[in-house]
Amino acid sequence: MSLLKVEDIHTYYGRSYILQGASLEVRKEEIVALLGRNGAGKTTTLKTIMGLVKPRAGRILFKDGDVTRLPAFKVARRGIGYVPQGRHLFPKMTVLENLKTGMRDQSDAQQLEGVFSLFPVLRERLNQLAGTLSGGEQQAVAISRALIKRPDIILLDEPTTGLMPIFVFKLKEIFKKLTENGIAILLVEEKIPFALSVADQVYFMVKGKIEYRAGKEELQGKKEILIRYLGVEV
């Protein structure tokens, strides 16, 4: 059963026609990777789902409700979390203060223990300025801030950018735990081997359109697909 369904979305930036009829879906407890070359429209897809950019046509359905025209804060309240590229932390605020920006009420504050179980290092860094953390620790704060709102799905834009290999490996474990806890993931990722290792379904985007969809098993040994749509050989 679909948790999130994007249907024939058309999105513009000014006169630039970015998404040209893009469609995809994410099921419950599923990890979906959206891959494509630079400028294909991947980030715009996430921003459109999140309500940060409004499409001119098409629909976005979430838990059978239409969220296409909702502002971003209402999309978040419906249960969609978002971790943008670059993390967007407040560097001169502490880790705890950054996490509090994702809280709505005391019930959200109670989610901190769950966050610490995923990222134990954050418990030790609560009073440290976010700008002094390592790249991996900053990403942990960004993901935790989204998880505090108890989303049903989390959108992640280039989560491995700037991370050391040890934390990239840690992310694999985190993703597994999230899906085991019922949270789906829609992932935009530049590290193709990482994306293919975690995703259940992969969508390939070319110039604002989804040109190919495949399950993880279908892509094994099919280098020609990666070369055709991404220009790389993994």
Residue ranges and their predicted role:
Residues 35-37:
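The feature captures the beta-strand-to-loop junction immediately N-terminal to the Walker
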Residues 154-158:
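Catalytic Walker B motif of ABC-type/P-loop ATPase nucleotide-binding domains
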